Amino acid sequence: PKLRSKVGMVFQHFELFPHLDLTRNLTLAQEIVLGRDSATARAKAGALLERVGLSAHAHKHPGQLSGGQQQRVAIARALSMDPMAMLFDEPTSALDPEMVNEVLDVMVELAEEGMTMMVVTHEMGFARRVANRVVFMEDGAIIEDSPTDRFFRDAASPQAQRFLSKILPHLSLIHI
């Protein structure tokens, strides 16, 4: 299989099929792209919805869910394709603040299980907790690329230092 079929992608606006229920959102690509039979795809969808805490909503359509729930469905859909790695494009930026943690909790679990993830995020507490490298960008350019502990302890670039000086006082108030 091509590399792109082994990489899961989760966008900031979920990109779920609004006319399909959650189960079908998770089974469609499994059946078409991976060639899984319907029963196997449905079983995997059910297990993944359970994993992200949404099995009771399997029959619902995306519009009937909160933003945080929709994003967890998007993560489950990406996982349904058995990816080797996951890409996340600002997965919490479109969410109400109270929904952010339910998505980050799922992502922390993935990291703890060893899933390779590349995450574009402004959630520095999350990055500090799960990342092994931080790539700091400004205006589309890579400014700094360093191990997480070094980035947060002793950022090399003035831009990263300025950014961190604004957010680090707030991170100390958050349990990481």
Question: Which stretches of residues belong to each language-model region?
Answer:
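C-terminal boundary and immediately downstream tail of ABC-type ATPase nucleotide-binding domains
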Residues: 149-173
